[in-house]
Amino acid sequence: MIEVRGLTMRYGRTVAVDDLTFTVKPGLVTGFLGPNGAGKSTTMRAVLGLEIPAAGEALVDGHAYASLRRPMRTMGALLDAGAVHGGRTARAHLGCLARSNGIDSRRVAAVLDQVGLAEVADRRIGGFSLGMKQRLGIAAALLGDPAVLMFDEPLNGLDPEGIRWIRDLLRSLAGEGRTVLLSSHLMNELALTAEHVVVIGRGRLIADTPTGALAAQFQRDVLVRSADPERLAEILRAHGVSVAPEDASDTGMHGTGMHGTGGLFVRGMDAAEIGELALRAGIALRELTPRSASLEEAFMELTEDSVEYGAGPAARSAAVSEVAR
């Protein structure tokens, strides 16, 4: 378990992390989200004892990381895949880490095989691609067979096969009862990997919730299809809700909308109320689908006021539209 309690990090007059509190529980992959400059990496460094807080604390299984005698046996972490000696081989790098933490040398070969680097174990790290360095960093995190794991942007440099591999790996590790904290900018992938999310902005906690619940908070609308869309739209508008015909660009389908298959996007009324209105009016419904925001859309709405450097409203709206498609 990772516990962050009232953590505050200051650099001169700048408050990078502001009274931040959250818990990363075992048995789940927890996504750690925030705009650039939100304080994610600073928080992770504080968990590893690499930064000294102005106030509060960060604990790993109830202890400060710096107080652990064999830290890699308790917690494995990947913060920077490039922070390795390029002149060493992968095997030598992991062997050095194993010796420093009293880890059985047989674990070196085991983790190299686990991350798919067994065939290049004796190549110098300086010749590795970014994706290979990421795999090596993951191997280092797994070396001590720890119960707690923390990864900062581990998907960088990985190809689609590698991304799928790490998704399956992290979920498997969490399924074994381990604590897994994952930071990533790849929202769609994070939505498939993380069961829980912690969102911060300007160093403060914004959300700490199951992934599905976060997206559900930002329900976009209800998609309704009926045999008489024009009459249904008239009834709905009479009840003060927003109604718009479905556009082909929303689904990639042609012939939609009031003059096609009867698709309407309804805002301001939930699916149950729409169904009751249609029933009373004698209008048969073909589809009634609440549409929640994607994780990326929910994240952008949540952090809109916490972005240090970002595009204007029009550009953000266009970006969300592209993501939604």
Q: Where on the chain are the PLM-derived regions?
A:
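Conserved NTP-handling cores and scaffolds of large molecular machines
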Residues: 101, 177, 240, 292, ...
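ABC transporter nucleotide-binding domain
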Residues: 166-266
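C-terminal coupling/interaction segments
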Residues: 267-325
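Hydrophobic C-terminal alpha-helix "anchor/cap" residues
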Residues: 142, 236-237, 278
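ABC transporter nucleotide-binding domains
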Residues: 2-4, 9-201, 207
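Short, flexible cytosolic linker that couples an ABC transmembrane/permease module to its adjacent nucleotide-binding
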Residues: 110, 212-216, 312-314
